[in-house]
Amino acid sequence: IMATCIDMAGATYPAKYKGNDIIPMAGKSLLPIFKTGHREGHDYLGFEHFNERAFLAKDGWKLVRPGENAKWELYNLNEDRSEQHNLADKYPEKKNEMVKAYEEWAKRCMVEPYPGQKKK
């Protein structure tokens, strides 16, 4: 949402503030959708909320970890929109690829580690 607000305001996201480097913005503006009905999307979309994690790929795969001690689950949303069939054991390479991409995203966006949590 921040990228959209900055775009609508005609502003630019700063690289520094008071001499301090600012973490680059990771999002993309939704303004092109409002203007043209189309926008180039991300290859992946990740989120975390109270230790529940999810990572969606442009090709329809979704990686889910429903809690800190839970195992990663993998779903093919093209064939299973209601996420009834966990395919993590059937497609371990795809799961591992997406876990690696999630971890890279989480580190880049400073999603993890949480304050007070030890780094892995």
Predicted regions and their residues:
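Short amphipathic beta-strand/extended segments with alternating polar/hydrophobic composition
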Residues: 63-65, 86-89
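C-terminal cap/loop subdomain of S1 sulfatases and analogous C-terminal strand-loop tails that border
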Residues: 2-77, 108-112
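Short, conserved loop/turn and helix-capping segments at secondary-structure boundaries
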Residues: 24, 88-92
